[in-house]
Each structure stands twice: as C-alpha cells, then as structure tokens.
Amino acid sequence: MSDFNPSTQLIGELALINCRDLGGMPLSGGRTFRKGIFIRSGSPEWLNHNEFLAVKKYGVTTVVDLRATAELEEFGNPFKDDPDTDFFSIPLFVGNPNDLNDKTMDYLRTHHLGDYYVIIMEELGDQVCQVLRVLLNSQGITLFHCAHGKDRTGVIAACLYLLAKASREDIINNYKVSFDYLGHFLDPLMARTSDDMKHTLRSDAINMEIFLNYIDSKWNGDIRLFMKSNGMTDVEIGSLYSKCIGES
C-alpha cells in the first residue's frame, strides 16, 4: 500500500455527501489517476437550488444515477430533467433497498455487502459496463452516485481503479473510508437500524476484499476480462484506460 491519503480526494466545496474526485490515486508505474474527470458521491436529492447550481458550476455535465428505479421514483434527482446535464439512470439494484422485505435486503441479513457486490458483477454485468461506457464517452466532469456513495458507487470506482492498475491495498483503503465520511449523515439511520443490518450502513474492509477476491478467482485478477465478457471491446477498454491515466 502507498502512503496515499484518500481524504485528499474529498471535494469539500460541494454539498454532496461522501463527494470525492477519483483522481490522485497512485497507480502502477508511478502514474496517478487523472483528476477532474470522474467524481463520486451520495444522492444529490438533498441539494437545495444553490447547492445544485454549485455542482453544475464545478463542471459536472454528466450524471449517472446507480440507484434502483424505485429509489429514483421516490426521491427524485435534480439532474434528471436538467437541460444542461446528460442524465443516465442505470440501476445496480433490482428491487428496493428501502424495503427491508426486499429479497436482496433479506439476503444481507446473513451475508456481507461484498457478497452483494459479487451479485452485481454476476447478474448486472451489462449494466456495470453501460456505466463504464458512459464514463468513457462523457465530456467534462461525470458524477456517478447511488444513495450513500459507498456500495454501488464503490463497485464502479473499484472497477475503474482496477483498470487503471491501482494496488489492492489502496482500493480497499479508498473504499473503507466512506463510512468515516458518512458517519454524521448516517448516525440517525444507524440508531434505528436493527443490529443484523447495521453492517449495511458501514464500509467494512472485508466487503472490498470479497469483491477483489472474486475478481481474482473469476477473472484472474484482470477486470478487462470481465469487461470483455460483458460486451466491451478492446478499443473501448483501452480508451477508458487512457482516459483514466490522462492519455486520452
């Protein structure tokens, strides 16, 4: 693991929760992940009008909402009908995570979040690659988000970091700090969540370890094989890699 401090990626001037630039992450060969192209966060549903305008002024021109259809319908998204924003809804959750009777939420009573991340890759691989294509083809700054910016968002961030050749340790460290950045926001929700579901609000290192172990075992540690298996071409994969490292 490098001595990289993930807190340097925080974007404090925006009111989005858990908002970070993916840039600055150390990569193999002495490279660093390109700054100013991809940012991640929790849902923008909480933004007031001035905070919404500040995100646009920051340079965000594309928004990818990874939340379930039910979440988008219930809570909305201020960017959905904004004429200046290319908006994409690409759900990485089938069902409704706010329904504790949902089959995935019931599954998480006895499984790690990391097991759910594997389900995303196994069952929603096409959607994951749809997101990656949007990131490849977007101009300006692209924001991708889910509800809290740690799970579905964390899967996409991990895919990008794997493609760009960040270290396993740095990817895990970058993942697990989400709960540190969300604590103040999640405290009330944590207080009323049952003990068997509290882990779903955290970002324990074991979750990303499970995800990376899956990539190692199923895809020989090469995220490109996953991408190709789900329809991305060598040209697309190479172009996204170049964009991530600043050579596009």
Give the label of every model feature segment.
Residues 1-143, 156-248:
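Cys-dependent protein tyrosine phosphatase-like superfamily
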Residues 148, 152-153:
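Ser/Thr-glycine-rich phosphate-binding loops at phosphate-binding pockets of nucleotides
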